[in-house]
Structures are given as structure tokens and as C-alpha cells.
Amino acid sequence: MSVSITKKFYKLDINRTEWEIPDIYQDLQPVGSGAYGQVSKAVVRGTNMHVAIKKLARPFQSAVHAKRTYRELRLLKHMDHENVIGLLDIFHPHPANGSLENFQQVYLVTHLMDADLNNIIRMQHLSDDHVQFLVYQILRGLKYIHSAGVIHRDLKPSNIAVNEDCELRILDFGLARPTENEMTGYVATRWYRAPEIMLNWMHYDQTVDIWSVGCIMAELITRRTLFPGTDHIHQLNLIMEMLGTPPAEFLKKISSESARSYIQSLPPMKGRSFKNVFKNANPLAIDLLEKMLELDAEKRITAEEALSHPYLEKYAEPSVEQTSPPYDHSFEDMDLPVDKWKELIYKEVTNFKPPPSYAQVLKDVK
């Protein structure tokens, strides 16, 4: 790991990628990488506070990349809820220069969480009380996200982070889209994906996230993936085996003729009893699962309704289950060249103000 110090920023090499970051962030250690960036953990100088820093990969490589960068930035800036990941800081090298020409990199700083639900499921058996608390926090975060007019669309155990106090945050908004837009294509990991996305219905709503929560909750209870499909068809078959083949009135709602024909070609299936599948589970947990894993999205429970379900009564506190101001997604309809997206991103970065508590940390460090 090579390091060269400049006045405020310093450079270091992490996994053969050059990082250039403010010197208040020290002891960087890589924690993960993907198609859209690398993440390292860091210590805020002079404190014992740890943060996560994400270096966006090729943010201005194309108009598609740049729009995605803008989307992720806007969503993270909008979110202000203790169960949803939000931005602590944004930076780019050469801020003093103030030139768009030198604006080539974007780094996002967020809370560092100890583990994700994947780790938790693999490491330990969770008590019913633990499951209640985790599911409550997921739904509390989702109520906030949905009230902003946003669908997450990629909820899965690895996108839900937990710290040692069992406090939870929903992560990874890069793929989220506003609810009003029609959306297509591959998004969520198949195992947690609602059937209406898989069947390519154009008009789906926020309850696709509730289906995902149902799959996650089932996994928290049993420590096994509920619908581990090897492909779309296998996935759909597993769902039908569990829930039964849908009635004719439901089939009429499916806009995809091929999906409708396929379901009609299946032998009639009665479905399995949730009580038999989740043999030792709290009966109230089973009731909530049945309401979340409802094939008909119009009948599926919402996040707000689920929060008042008797299973979560111990933790329910409507006065702190806040909603969000509407998220402005008008830019989604914009088709701009890279340079224009870059200008918009630069404006968002330079206008950013850290949350008050973190602003105080930064002030004390300086």
C-alpha cells in the first residue's frame, strides 16, 4: 500500500486502484467491491469513529454511468432516517481548484455497519424477539422510503446491515427507482424478487419490497432460503408449490401473455400450509408472513400496515415511524449528455452539507 501525502488529500493504492482522500480519513481497509465501486472502511482522525467510504467506479464513463451516479447521490442525500443508509460526507480531489475539468472522481462517506443479515443468518440462530426487532426496523425504514415515493427493488439479506446493538440500516439505493416510472430488466436477486417483477408486469408498486421482506423474514426464522430458484421458471415453480396456483381472477391481472400461458399450463397445486413450513415459529409471525407473501400484489400488506401487525406490537411506536418528504425524481425523464450530468453531480457535491452531528465531528477534527 503506497502513500503520498499532499496538503489536505493523500493518495494510496487499494486493490490496484488509486484513492485520493482527505487526511481526516485514516487506516483505510478494503471491505468490498462491485461493478459500481469499491468500499473501504476508515477511521476519522483523532476519534474512534469508523466510516465506510465508497469510491464510485468510472462515474462519468458514459451518460448511463453518469445518470446512475446522479441517481445514487440524490437518493442518498434525500434519505434521513436511522434505519436507512444516508450520507455523512461527499468529497472529490482538487476541490480548491473548482474546475469541472478536474472533477473526475466521487467518494461517498456513510455509516460503517458491523455485518449484514447474510452474516447474521449464517453465524447464529435468532430468537423470535430478535426476528421481531429486525423485521420491525426493516419495515420502519421501508415505510420512510415508500413515503418518499421510492421503491428499493433490491432488498436482500446482503443489502441490510446491522451493528452489534442489532440496529439496522437498509443499504444500496443505486438501483432504486421512483414508483411512477415504468421499469424493466434485471434488478433484484432472483430469490427475493416478487413474482410480478419476474413475470415482467410493467406496473408494479412498492409492495414488491414487502415480498422481499417476507422472503428475508422466512430466512431469519429458518436459516434457509425460502425460494432458492436456479432460474426464473424454477423460481416461479417454487413459489407456486408454496402458495398454490392462482385463481382465474388473478390470472386476468397478468399483462404478459406468455407468463399467463405458462401459469395456466402448470398442474393445479394446492400450496403448502405455512404452519407446516414454519413448524416452531410464533403463530403471529406466520400470520404476518402470509400477508407479506401474497401472490396478488393488490392484496399484499403495505409497510405501514405491517408495522401495526400484532407480531410487532412489542416494538411498534407510531410516533417515531416517520415519513419522508416527496423525493423529486423529475430528472429520471431527462436524457442528457455526460457533460450535463457531470455538471448536475458537481452541483450536488458542492452543495452538500453533512448532517449536524457529523459536521460537529468534522469541525472537531479540523
Swiss-Prot record:
Write the gene name: p38a
The cofactors required by this protein are: Mg(2+)
Quote a single Gene Ontology cellular component term: nucleus
- Domain remarks in the Swiss-Prot or TrEMBL record: The TXY motif contains the threonine and tyrosine residues whose phosphorylation activates the MAP kinases.
The residues forming a coiled coil are none
Q: Which residues carry this modification: Phosphotyrosine?
A: Y186
Kindly report, in one word, the top-level EC class recorded for this enzyme.
Answer: transferase
Catalytic activities: L-seryl-[protein] + ATP = O-phospho-L-seryl-[protein] + ADP + H(+); L-threonyl-[protein] + ATP = O-phospho-L-threonyl-[protein] + ADP + H(+)
Its EC number is 2.7.11.24
Gene3D superfamilies associated with the record: Phosphorylase Kinase, domain 1, Transferase(Phosphotransferase) domain 1
Q: What is the lineage of its organism?
A: Eukaryota, Metazoa, Ecdysozoa, Arthropoda, Hexapoda
Record's function text? Kinase involved in a signal transduction pathway. May down-regulate insect immunity gene expression after prolonged infection.
Compartments where located: Nucleus
What name has this protein been given in UniProt? Answer: Mitogen-activated protein kinase p38a
Q: What organism is the protein native to?
A: Drosophila melanogaster (Fruit fly)
Cross-referenced Pfam families:
Pkinase (PF00069)
Domain of life (superkingdom)? Eukaryota
**UniProt keyword annotations, A-Z:** ATP-binding, Kinase, Nucleotide-binding, Nucleus, Phosphoprotein, Serine/threonine-protein kinase, Transferase
Give the main location. nucleus
Give the modified residues of type Phosphothreonine.
Answer: T184
Record-annotated Protein kinase domain positions: 25-312
Modification after translation is described as: Dually phosphorylated on Thr-184 and Tyr-186, which activates the enzyme.
InterPro entries noted in UniProt: Kinase-like_dom_sf, MAP_kinase, MAP_kinase_CS, MAPK_p38-like, Prot_kinase_dom, Protein_kinase_ATP_BS
Query: What's the family?
Result: Belongs to the protein kinase superfamily. CMGC Ser/Thr protein kinase family. MAP kinase subfamily.
